[in-house]
Amino acid sequence: ALVRGEDSYVWDAEGNRYLDLFPGWGCGLLGHCPGPVVEAVREQLGLLIHVPNTWHTELQGRWAEALSTRSFGGQAFFCNSGTEANEAAIKLVRLHSTPKRRYKIITFEGSFHGRTLGSTTATAQPKYHEGLGPLMAGFVYAPFGDLDAVARLIGEDTAAIMIEPIQGEGGVRIPPDGFLAGLRKLADEND
């Protein structure tokens, strides 16, 4: 069993050192116990450990402003995980689009959006769907990088296009040049 880690190395209970070649998930890609992260966590532990999202904190406000000014602008919603962020995105899309009778969300083959039912349904990989019974309705899948296929899937009932800009499930898949801009254009043309 592993008992500690530092940078790219981990140690087991017997003191054996191993080079950790696993890329990790989003929260683990900085290595094991990187100094600046450890110090920031120590500092935060002396201030606030956890508050529910019904409370506002100064740091949250600063992060929300930084995210909003560097992205699409508007509001920010903080979550505990990528799955929770994707579930919130699905709900917000449905909430906004239901009055327009839109519900369909286009996702991409090879994607991974999480392990809850909605996020698993958004994940366009049959191996994650096996044994789950009926999945959440309203998801359709397009080949990653194929703008023409996406355009064919868009209809009056389409509410959103959901994409990992760079896919990481089973390797790193970078979209072809112009693909993300093309998706933005398709979305804008179809409200």
Predicted regions and their residues:
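Generic structural signal for well-ordered, non-membrane alpha-helical segments
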Residues: 3, 7, 34, 56-60, ...
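Conserved PLP-binding active-site segment in aminotransferase class I/II-type PLP enzymes
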Residues: 1-6, 26, 43, 186-190
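PLP-dependent aminotransferase-class I/II
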Residues: 5, 110-167, 171-185, 189
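Active-site and channel-lining beta-strand-loop segments
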Residues: 1-20
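Conserved beta-strand and immediately adjacent loop positions that scaffold enzyme active sites
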Residues: 7-9, 75, 104, 138
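Short beta-strand-to-turn element immediately C-terminal to the catalytic PLP-Schiff-base lysine
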Residues: 11-12, 30-32, 121-122
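Short, well-ordered beta-strand elements within core beta-sheets of diverse protein domains
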Residues: 9, 29-30, 140-141
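Glycine-rich loop-to-alpha-helix module at the N-terminal edge of alpha/beta enzyme cores
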Residues: 17-106
